[in-house]
Amino acid sequence: MHSLPRSGSIRRTHSDTQATGWPPPQRIGDSPGPSPAFLSCPPSLCGGAAQTGDPVALPHGPEKWVWGGGLSPRNPHSWGIKAHGLRPPWAPRLERCMVPESEWAPWQPQLPCEPKWLGSRKSKPHRESGLRGGGPSRCAKRGTHSCGPRESGGPDTCHLPCH
């Protein structure tokens, strides 16, 4: 009787992950499935997360990395960033349940400039979001058009992002 409600709750988590697009559906029947399913992540982390009482955190966390990073080992093309980012995220993945920001912040900087990203953050994201300009080619435009007026405020800010 006790195992019934238990497997019901577990099944719910699985069906939830299934909806999210969790690749291996065969593991739904397995109770110990999640552990082998996330072999990519250290057993200590996997076990710790499960014991924490956040079963959803396990499937939802890895699901993201398995989707984006899990393909990297097979696709050498993604190895550059995805595979690299697959390692650090395992730690943030657990925090991600509490702080969603910690999930994207840690692996974002690992791209080209890890330490600089914090400082360049103001210029990089602005460039991509197009808050200051209007598109990806805007960087070149900023170099000529915005550089003039922007120089009075801060020439560094104008030259750094463009070059």
Swiss-Prot record:
Highest rank taxon of the organism: Eukaryota
Chain positions covered by the region annotation Disordered: 1-78, 115-163
Further information: This protein has no orthologs in other species and appears to be the product of a protein-coding gene which has arisen since divergence from chimp.
Name used for this protein in its record: Uncharacterized protein DNAH10OS
Organism: Homo sapiens
Taxonomic lineage: Eukaryota, Metazoa, Chordata, Craniata, Vertebrata
Gene that specifies this protein: DNAH10OS
